[in-house]
Amino acid sequence: MVFQPNSGFVHVARRGVTLVELLVVIVIITVLMAMLLPAVNVARESGRQAACQNNLRQFGVGFSSHVARRGTYCTGAFDWRRDGCVTEVGWVADLVQSGTPVGKMLCPSNPARIALTFNDLLSMAWDVDTCVPDRRGSPPQTMPDGSRRINPCRFLAEGDPSSSTPPPTGEDRRLFVEKEILLKHFNTNYTASWYLVRSGVVLDGSGNLVARQPGCSASLLARGSTLGPLNAARLDSSSAPASNVPLLGCGAAGGMLEANLGDNDSNSPAVMPFTRGPVQTATLEAPPPFSAGTPMATWWAVWNATLQDYRGFAPVHRNTCNLLFADGSVRAIADQNGDGLLNNGFPSNLGGFRDATVEMPPDDVFSKWSLRPN
C-alpha cells in the first residue's frame, strides 16, 4: 500500500492464482471425488437392496393371505405358455387382484426389467392344448350396460367372435399387450422357485416322471407332471423348516425381449418365470427314464441325489441375491466366487459354475427333490 498526495491511499493489485495452484486444487477435488463416489455408490445400492427386500416382504404377506384364503400360496407361475392366462392365473395375478401393483415393484438393481413370458404374449400362436390350463382364461362377461368384457389373454387368442373382431396382430398386438397387461402391473423381474409353483413331482411305480393326463409329455416344468402350487399341508409336513424353503428371488435373465414394450427396448434381458426344479448334479438334467419294474430303492436313490437348479436366481445386488422364504423372511445370499451364480452343491465347470464353492448350503436353503420327509 502507498500514499499519493492527490489520490490518497491505493491498493496494490493482488497476485492472481497460478496455473500450478489451479492444478493442485483440481487434483485435490478429483481425489476427493474418487474417495467419495464409491461410498455414494455403496449407499445407493444399499437403498436399492432395502427396497428389493421390502418388495419381497410385501409379496410374502400376499402369499400368506392367499394360503389362508385358498389353501395354496399362489395359483401358479407368471407363465402364459404353461400356466394359463397371466391376468387371472399365477402369483403375479393373485397379488395384482388383491391390490398389490407387482409391475411397479421391480427389483431396482436388476438390469432385467421384464418377464420372459411377454415374448409368448407378443408372438405365440394360440391353439387348443388340453395338456395345459386354458390359456384364454375366463369366458367373456356381459356387463350391466350390455357391453362385453373380454380378458386380455382371450382377446389375444381369439379376438371377439361376437363382433367378428379378429385377434390383434403385429403392431396392434404389441400395443394391446403393452396397454392391457404390462401397464396394468402384470409384470415382474423376480423369479419364482419351483417349490412355489410346482412343489413336487408325479412319479410312477418305477420312479419315472409322468403326466397325469394321457397323451401329454412329462416335464419338470409342466403342471401336469407336478403337484402344482405349494399348499399349506405340503409345507407343514415338509422335512425342511419354512425358513429354508425359498419362494421368490431376484431373477436371472432367461432370454431377450423380442420387441419394444413400455420402457423396455427390444433385446433387453428378460427374467425366466421359475427355476427348473430338481436335476442331477452331473448333467443338470432330470433323471433319465428307469426301466419298468425298477425297485424303489434304486430310483429313490437317484432322485434323492438331485439338487434344485437355482440358476434362475441372480446376485444383482453387488454380488448378493435377495430371497423370500416360506416363513416370510427375506435373506441376502452372497455369490462368494463372483461367477454370477448361486451354487447349492454342483461341481465346478458345469452350467457356468466357476468352482464347487457352496454358497447355499442345505442348512440355509433347502434343495431336495421333494418336500416330503425322507
PLM regions and their residue ranges:
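Short catalytic/ligand-binding loop motif for oxyanion handling, primarily in non-cytosolic enzymes
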Residues: V67-A68, C74-G76, R82, R113-F118, ...
